[in-house]
């Protein structure tokens, strides 16, 4: 039987066993993570902004050199753009260079006339669009009103039909209405097999015969007459 569950009144203590006189010599194992890792100071190298290097640098001169280099780079691209702009401007014909033979009364001579013509055409287009928009709105409103009127008429017709069909007296008065049929509908169990099977048996001659029905058997009838009735 195990004794693991029993309480320990005398726990084990280190230093009392064989070779355990000195507790500091119990184990010679140690982890590599316990060793000293960073034992030397890291100094800044060249091009890492060391104090001596920063002290000997002339920041103003470096800034001026970078500005001059940026200006030279900008001026290098400027003549190309100016040349392309001048060439595009030179391609545009001037008004005084157009020969007199090409001048016509229908040709626009000023930009103001072009602007006036464009404004008039824009106004005409805006007016046409507004008129078309008003026409569309009017057609939609008429269509909506027509649908609402048809829906109301259909609802009224359905309501009148429900009123007339719900009252049998009103159905009889109408000449166009079909004749109402008050015949009682047959029950769902009118044609079942064992309905009214025992009806009229007492009037007939009682002969002992086998019936495949426990409720209509002779034994059941005698039992009911003897103990229940």
Swiss-Prot record:
Residues 24-34 have a biased composition (Polar residues). Residues 52-84 have a biased composition (Basic and acidic residues). Its main location: nucleus. One of its GO terms (molecular function) is RNA binding. Pfam families: Cwf_Cwc_15. Residues 104-126 have a biased composition (Acidic residues). The modification Phosphothreonine is found at residues 47, 110. The modification Phosphoserine is found at residue 121. The modification N6-acetyllysine is found at residue 18. GO terms for biological process: mRNA cis splicing, via spliceosome; mRNA splicing, via spliceosome. Identified in the spliceosome C complex. Component of the PRP19-CDC5L splicing complex composed of a core complex comprising a homotetramer of PRPF19, CDC5L, PLRG1 and BCAS2, and at least three less stably associated proteins CTNNBL1, CWC15 and HSPA8. Interacts directly with CTNNBL1 in the complex. Component of the minor spliceosome, which splices U12-type introns. Involved in pre-mRNA splicing as component of the spliceosome. Component of the PRP19-CDC5L complex that forms an integral part of the spliceosome and is required for activating pre-mRNA splicing. As a component of the minor spliceosome, involved in the splicing of U12-type introns in pre-mRNAs. This is Spliceosome-associated protein CWC15 homolog. It comes from Rattus norvegicus.
């Amino acid at each position: 039987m195990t004794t693991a569950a029993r309480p320990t009144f005398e726990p084990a203590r280190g230093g009392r066993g064989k070779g355990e006189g000195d507790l500091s010599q119990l184990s010679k194992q140690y982890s590599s993570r316990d060793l000293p890792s960073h034992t030397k100071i890291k100094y800044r190298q060249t091009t890492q902004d060391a104090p001596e290097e920063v002290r000997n640098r002339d920041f103003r001169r470096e800034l001026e050199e970078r500005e001059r280099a940026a200006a030279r780079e900008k001026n290098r691209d400027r003549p190309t753009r100016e040349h392309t702009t001048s060439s595009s401007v030179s391609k545009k014909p001037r008004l005084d260079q157009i020969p007199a033979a090409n001048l016509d009364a229908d040709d626009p001579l000023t930009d103001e006339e072009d602007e006036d013509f464009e404004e008039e055409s824009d106004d005409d287009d805006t007016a046409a669009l507004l008129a078309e928009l008003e026409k569309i709105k009017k057609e939609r409103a008429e269509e909506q009103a027509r649908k609402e009127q048809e829906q109301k008429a259909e609802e009224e017709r359905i309501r009148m039909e429900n009123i007339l069909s719900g009252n049998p007296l009103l159905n009889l008065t109408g000449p166009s209405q079909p004749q109402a049929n008050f015949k009682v509908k047959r029950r769902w169990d009118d044609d079942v097999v064992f309905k009214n099977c025992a009806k009229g048996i007492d009037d007939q001659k009682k002969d002992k015969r086998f019936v495949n029905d426990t409720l209509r058997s002779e034994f059941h009838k005698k039992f009911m007459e003897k103990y229940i009735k």
